[in-house]
């Protein structure tokens, strides 16, 4: 069920929702329905207009929503989140349901270049799977020099205090304000002083990206007295002009799964294999190729 966000699919119940989400959605439905009864002149469409008995039973709650919205949404759970009662949800639970439960809608064309938004929507949900991981973002090469950029004055001590051990950044070779040219990835193990850089064209980082690498090296030297362990990919395996963003996301996802850096860069995915990952990362599944198991190793087959 590839519309679900990473590790969100419940195969037994064929749903992307967890029971806590369904409980809050049922409460929101009841609040909305109660307001309707107080304002009968307003135009609402509910189907079965009975309140839902609230209990932590996933099968039961799924059936309640199917009974009420089956004619409108069928089995489309995204459709359910577009119903008016969802406006009664607030805070983190609403954000989790709307932005964390499902894969995002990606580019419609199978070889369309990934935007900053596309990349962020792929990567941010992995923070929920790995609580000690933070995705810094898809950023320009000179991000560390731009005050509105997340790498500007980045505080590694604070990240460690917050329980963050791993961070990742996807850089564009262009600087802030430029249109964008090529995506590359950086993965950092803060506690152990390890930094891995991966350009699918097999090149060293540009001087602007080197600034960010050097800042981490200086931090780790001050903190531990040791030099960082730094590796970069020397193998050129991208054979097209469209998949650099997908390669960059895939590199980080595989690093998070525990796959060794050397294995990732020496066993790279072909164009067909990396393009197939779009069918895992985006719910509209634009690629004509069957998803490769290494698109998301920890979520393979789910």
Curated annotation (Swiss-Prot):
Keywords assigned: Hydrolase, Protease, Thiol protease, Virion
Protein name, UniProt field: Putative thiol protease R355
InterPro entries: Papain-like_cys_pep_sf (IPR038765), Peptidase_C48_C (IPR003653), VPRT (IPR016510)
Gene Ontology MF term list: cysteine-type endopeptidase activity
A single BP term in Gene Ontology: viral protein processing
Coiled coil: none
UniProt GO cellular component terms: virion component
Enzyme Commission no: 3.4.22.-
Recorded superkingdom: Viruses
Location, primary (coarse class): virion
Entry's localization field: Virion
EC class of the enzyme, as a word: hydrolase
PROSITE patterns documented for this protein: ULP_PROTEASE
Active site: 182, 199, 244
Family designation: Belongs to the peptidase C48 family.
């Amino acid at each position: 069920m590839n519309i679900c966000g990473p590790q969100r699919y419940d195969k037994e119940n064929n749903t992307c929702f967890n029971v806590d989400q369904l409980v809050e959605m049922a409460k929101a439905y009841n609040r909305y329905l109660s307001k309707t009864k107080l304002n009968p002149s307003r135009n609402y469409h509910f189907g079965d207009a009975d309140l839902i008995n609230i209990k932590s039973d996933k099968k039961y709650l799924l059936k309640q929503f199917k009974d009420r919205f089956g004619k409108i949404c069928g089995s489309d759970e995204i459709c359910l989140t577009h119903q008016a009662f969802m406006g009664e949800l607030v805070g983190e639970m609403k954000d989790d349901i709307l932005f964390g439960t499902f894969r995002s809608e990606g580019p419609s064309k199978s070889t369309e270049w990934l935007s900053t938004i596309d990349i962020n929507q792929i990567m941010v949900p992995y923070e929920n799977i790995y609580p000690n991981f933070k995705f810094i973002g898809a950023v320009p090469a000179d991000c560390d020099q731009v005050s509105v950029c997340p790498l500007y004055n980045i505080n590694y001590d604070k990240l460690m205090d917050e329980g963050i051990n791993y961070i990742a950044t996807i850089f564009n070779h262009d600087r802030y304000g430029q249109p964008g040219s090529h995506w590359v990835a950086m993965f950092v193990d803060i506690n152990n002083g390890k930094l891995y850089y991966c350009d699918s064209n097999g090149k060293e980082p540009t001087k602007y990206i080197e600034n960010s690498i050097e800042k981490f090296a200086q931090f780790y030297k001050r903190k531990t007295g040791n030099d960082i362990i730094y590796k970069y990919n020397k193998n050129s395996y991208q054979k097209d002009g469209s998949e650099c963003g997908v390669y960059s996301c895939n590199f980080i996802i595989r690093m998070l799964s525990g796959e060794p850096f050397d294995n990732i860069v020496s066993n790279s995915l072909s164009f067909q294999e990396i393009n197939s990952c779009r069918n895992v990362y985006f719910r509209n599944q634009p690629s004509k190729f069957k998803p490769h198991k290494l698109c998301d190793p920890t979520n393979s087959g789910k």
